[in-house]
Amino acid sequence: MGGDKENLDLSDLNASLPAAAAALSAEDRAGLVNALKDKLQSLAGQHTDVLEALSPNVRKRVEYLREIQGQHDEIELKFFEERAALEAKYQKLYEPLYTKRYNIVNGVVEVDGGNDEPASENAAEGKDADAKGVPDFWLTAMKTNEVLSEEIQERDEPALKYLKDIKWARIDDPKGFKLDFFFDTNPFFKNSVLTKTYHMVDEDEPILEKAIGTEIEWYPGKNLTQKILKKKPKKGSKNAKPITKTEVCESFFNFFSPPQVPDDDEDIDEDTADELQGQMEHDYDIGTTIRDKIIPHAVSWFTGEAVQAEDFDDMEDDEEDDEDDDEDEEEEEEDEDEDEDDEEEKSKPKKKSAGKPKLPSKGGAQGGADQPADCKQQ
């Protein structure tokens, strides 16, 4: 067994990972792999120590359980493959609908009767009467979402008004997915498409390896992710020119400059690894929100209907939690009442009994149970 321990590497953990991967899939969360190699190797050593501590008979049973787990993982692998094929099939069915949406949003085509329909009494006169398509469609849709609204700063909005479409697609080499943001010609940057790509460790395990974003070609003085501070020189200073300092500030466009994992994980201490993992999870949360919520249901976010639907779901979850809390409180009250009854019985003077002793009450006493700076318009 000692030799096995020395030869154990990360690949020996694969048999124990699918269950964790499934949990991550349910919550749609991402893990930071490179920074956790040391922890995984430590777990590998613990895994070997556990087996060594078992008696031969128990160890044999555990090994058989691991064989059963391997059979389970093979079935799970087929599930992942079939799910990917099913998603690809329906993605093709969605595409024509997304094309129609693009054409309407950007004024490429007009909806039948769109120019003839009388305006409602609540419609703002002349505000968008001459506008093509649906102005600020994607900006409004994203701002309505709670996760994305925290990322979009006021100074980002003029640039995001030029956003024409958002698409996503799976990638195969390496496995993962990408988001494409299509922009009209604008005064902020040269790029017509900004892309964010997520590389996954394995095609079947939603564990994030790294994220890559397009380098934005900002026009001079238009970089929304930076603010320029000018400080006047001190009186009597030989340098009469103002001191200029550039600082990174909060902006939605920081999404295209994701946190990077160092190639050598030995350079990362535990606190830095935890901070980096939090940043990557947040970045992945933004990406999957756009992929899974905004793109497929954009008009519902534009109108606010999606928020109402999410609020309704949250209310149902809260009601279930409240019911569980009420049940717990009732059980605690019953336990307290039973404890009080027991105390009263104990405090009463005992009488001699010629018969059998009374059994204790069935309800006996129970045991108790660094952020970037805010940017102002340059």
UniProtKB/Swiss-Prot annotation:
Location (main, coarse): nucleus
Signal peptide annotation: none
Gene3D superfamilies in alphabetical order: 1.20.5.1500, Nucleosome assembly protein
Feature: compositional bias, Acidic residues: 308-344
Modified residues (Cysteine methyl ester): C375
Role of this protein: May modulate chromatin structure by regulation of nucleosome assembly/disassembly.
Protein name as catalogued: Nucleosome assembly protein 1;1
